[in-house]
Amino acid sequence: MMRALNLVSKTTRGWLVGGIVFSGMLCGCHREPAPSPAEAARAAVRAATLRPADERLAALYDHSCRACHANAQANAPLTGDRAAWRSRLKKGNPELVQHVLMGFNGMPPGGQCFTCTTADFDALIAFMSN
């Protein structure tokens, strides 16, 4: 009898610990709230007008980044939309550059910038995320 109680107790403890761990994992699943239609429209207009001050960087942006990052239908984070970039920036610039280099979700490998260096990608990410 004592052995049966001990087994139930271990099983119950296992379920409790599993439930707590699972609950903790669910708490980590968080998405940024979707912007209102008006906010999304403002972000799209802003993204379409922004351009790096540095002419070389501006040429790289125009050639390789603008088509997706200034187009809301592309589902890429819009240039200048800090809220859209916030969760990505939390991953750190090295990981974001790795996503550019290797491709990630809709991002093509190399970001379609075959002449860009890692420093260029760092600068383009900094520009687009501010």
At which residue positions do the language-model features occur?
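Electrostatic cytochrome c docking/interface patches
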Residues: 35-59, 75-86
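Axial heme c-ligation environment in periplasmic c-type cytochrome domains
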Residues: 78, 99-128
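Extracytoplasmic/secreted proteins, especially bacterial periplasmic and envelope-associated proteins
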Residues: 56, 60, 84, 95, ...
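The canonical Cys-X-X-Cys-His
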Residues: 61-71, 124, 128
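Bacterial signal peptide processing site
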Residues: 29-32
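Gly/Gly-Pro-rich "capping" loops immediately C-terminal to redox-active cysteine motifs
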Residues: 70-98
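Sec-dependent bacterial lipoprotein signal peptides
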Residues: 1-27
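Disulfide-bonded cysteine motifs in exported proteins
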Residues: 22-24, 60-63
